[in-house]
């Protein structure tokens, strides 16, 4: 079975979060008896850890991904689960995100003849959803049984314009804030009898909206406070509002913590009557550019694609953050990501074959 045939097989599973649609049974059969399998299934989510010990070296490289895809939606030009190749292009749900990566590392790992240590594959059926019972639960189990990998490659689509142009060496965290400025409702004709929370907050908005909370560094852009919602009043012109609500998000680097954001907001709102709540949806992580897995991936991309790749930490969150939280040196590399989650999501045969060759080279030379 070629990697493209494997890719097509995976695409035909209607594995919408958190349903694997039988894909994991197929994968276990595909890998064969040489690969051991650990299962952690919780709350309708399936997690699989396949591993093969080549020798007693403690080095452990894990490839990671998710089998689940987002819902299809309407307006597709082709059947999103037919996985047909037309002029070198495969249009299907999950083509970029991320069954291309899954196929590439499954093929590369199955066909690896030698490796200095242990090769493993971690996959979940819930990355596109909440992920509460996904990758993190498998990693918790692996820690309990002392099988945490040293290094991880998450095959998410990372490239931006040209295949091979970017690897993720980290991800920003996500901090959400909810502010309520309190006032006193009244008639617009008698502003002296009202406490208008909009007026009281107006001079503060420029001090927090779009402000960089740090200066960034060689890995991360500055952590910026982004206002996502402001609302007050009853959509009438003669009543002042009783309260003003503001929501914001900060995609934070390792240079800014939730406590930093909390202190920044409280300092700026001093003197106002307000409520403030802050939550951390995910934590940032970064893998040092001198890490073995970073250097090895750079070399493999150059060997196969003749491209000097760049390091990136841009974009949203991914399951790579869980590897970082467990002290695993993790990076991400996959195909171009220009149609992820969209109607007519697609990738090319050339990219999938190239990704497979990069992974094969990485395994061979790691």
Curated annotation (Swiss-Prot):
Give the metabolic or biological pathway: Amino-acid biosynthesis; L-lysine biosynthesis via DAP pathway; LL-2,6-diaminopimelate from (S)-tetrahydrodipicolinate (succinylase route): step 3/3
Query: Which residues take part in binding Zn(2+) 2?
Result: 97, 128, 341
> A Pfam family name for this chain?
M20_dimer
Q: Provide the residue positions that the database annotates as binding Zn(2+) 1.
A: 66, 97, 156
Q: What is its EC number?
A: 3.5.1.18
User: Is the keyword Amino-acid biosynthesis assigned to this protein?
Assistant: yes
Q: Does the keyword section mention Hydrolase?
A: yes
Highest taxon of the source? Bacteria
Which residues does the entry assign to the active site, renumbered to this chain? 68, 127 (proton acceptor)
Q: Which cofactor does it need?
A: Zn(2+); Co(2+)
Q: What are the entry keywords? A: Amino-acid biosynthesis, Cobalt, Diaminopimelate biosynthesis, Hydrolase, Lysine biosynthesis, Metal-binding, Zinc
Free-text comment on the cofactor: Binds 2 Zn(2+) or Co(2+) ions per subunit.
The chemistry this enzyme catalyses reads: N-succinyl-(2S,6S)-2,6-diaminopimelate + H2O = (2S,6S)-2,6-diaminopimelate + succinate
Identify the enzyme class.
Answer: hydrolase
GO: which molecular function terms?
acetylornithine deacetylase activity; metal ion binding; succinyl-diaminopimelate desuccinylase activity
Q: Which GO terms describe its biological process?
A: diaminopimelate biosynthetic process; L-arginine biosynthetic process; lysine biosynthetic process via diaminopimelate
Protein task: Catalyzes the hydrolysis of N-succinyl-L,L-diaminopimelic acid (SDAP), forming succinate and LL-2,6-diaminopimelate (DAP), an intermediate involved in the bacterial biosynthesis of lysine and meso-diaminopimelic acid, an essential component of bacterial cell walls.
State how it assembles.
Answer: Homodimer.
Q: Which family does it belong to?
A: Belongs to the peptidase M20A family. DapE subfamily.
Q: Which HAMAP family match?
A: DapE
Q: What is this protein called?
A: Succinyl-diaminopimelate desuccinylase
> What is the scientific name of the source organism?
Aliarcobacter butzleri (strain RM4018)
């Amino acid at each position: 079975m070629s990697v493209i045939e494997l890719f097509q097989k995976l695409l035909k599973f209607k594995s919408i979060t958190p349903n694997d649609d039988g894909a994991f049974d197929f994968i276990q059969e595909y890998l064969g008896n040489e690969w051991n399998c650990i299962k952690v299934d919780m709350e309708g989510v399936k997690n699989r850890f396949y591993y093969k010990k080549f020798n007693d070296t403690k080095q452990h490289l894990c490839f990671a991904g998710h089998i689940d895809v987002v819902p299809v939606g309407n307006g597709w030009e082709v059947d999103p689960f037919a996985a047909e190749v037309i002029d070198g292009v495969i249009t299907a749900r999950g083509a970029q995100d991320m069954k291309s990566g899954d196929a590439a590392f499954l093929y590369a790992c199955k066909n690896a003849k030698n490796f200095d240590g242990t090769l493993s594959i971690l996959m979940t059926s819930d990355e596109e959803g909440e992920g509460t019972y996904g990758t993190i639960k498998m990693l918790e189990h692996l820690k309990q049984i002392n099988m945490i990998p040293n290094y991880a490659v998450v095959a998410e689509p990372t490239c931006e314009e040209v295949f091979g142009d970017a690897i993720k060496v980290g991800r920003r965290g996500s901090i959400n804030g909810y502010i309520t400025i309190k006032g006193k409702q009244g008639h617009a004709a008698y502003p002296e009898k009202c406490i208008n929370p909009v007026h009281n907050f107006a001079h503060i908005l420029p001090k927090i909206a779009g402000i960089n909370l740090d200066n960034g560094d060689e890995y991360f852009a500055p952590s910026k406070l982004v206002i996502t919602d402001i609302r007050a009043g009853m959509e009438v012109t003669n009543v002042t509002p009783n309260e003003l609500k503001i929501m914001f998000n900060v995609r934070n680097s390792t240079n800014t913590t939730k406590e930093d954001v909390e202190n920044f907001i409280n300092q700026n709102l001093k003197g106002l009557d307000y409520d403030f709540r802050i939550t951390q949806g995910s934590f940032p992580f970064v893998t040092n550019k001198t890490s073995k897995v970073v250097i090895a991936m750079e070399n493999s991309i150059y060997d196969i694609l003749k491209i000097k790749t760049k390091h990136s930490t841009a974009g949203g969150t991914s399951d790579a953050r869980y590897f970082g939280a467990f002290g695993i040196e993790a990076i991400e590399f996959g195909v171009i990501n220009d149609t992820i989650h969209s109607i007519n999501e697609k990738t090319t045969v050339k990219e999938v074959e190239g990704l497979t060759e990069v992974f094969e080279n990485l395994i061979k030379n790691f």
